Amino acid sequence: HINHTLFFKTFLTRLFALYFDYSHTKLRWSDVGMYFQKTSAFDPKDKNNILNTGLIHQDGNFPLVGLVYLTKDACKDSGTSIMLPNKKYKHRPELADEKVRLHKIPQEKLTKKDLEDRKKLILSLNENFEESIRFNNKFNRLITYTGTDFHKCNSFYSGQDERLTLVFFVGKMKSNSQTPLQRLKNQLIQGK
């Protein structure tokens, strides 16, 4: 049995210790969502089937987003990639609408046409982006990024029945200090 409140607070306290020195920093956070996410391969027999690829997306205007991989002995290729728009990139609202439509349909209820539409959507999205950073799926590995970073699951095929992750979204952080990236940007601006 898990004490959800204690787990939630302990996890966040340890997470923020990676960014802030508590002996010199006052920190408050709010609007945090956290949940366990189980996903299954669209094609459990073919690891390389493009349908097993996640859709490139953003999570919203969150200063900190991330996940912890929780599938033991998972296929390392079932990790996550941070994506950057390439020269072909242009905002296409119809792709966002199609993502929403397909996401609302439970995986087991997708028709052959829905799967073909998903394949076309994956290909359309992929041609507008290039991979910037690749994280392999390793049990208990934590990755973080911002909600505005484009990213995708590289494969829902984990080599197991399901791909289990702990996903979190931090809506607000207030501190008398800066995150490491903020400090770096300020030093670059000041020329130090």
Please report, for each region that a protein language model flagged, where it lies by residue.
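Catalytic core of non-heme Fe(II) oxygenases with the double-stranded beta-helix
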Residues: 44-150, 154-189
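Non-heme Fe(II)-dependent double-stranded beta-helix
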Residues: 1-44
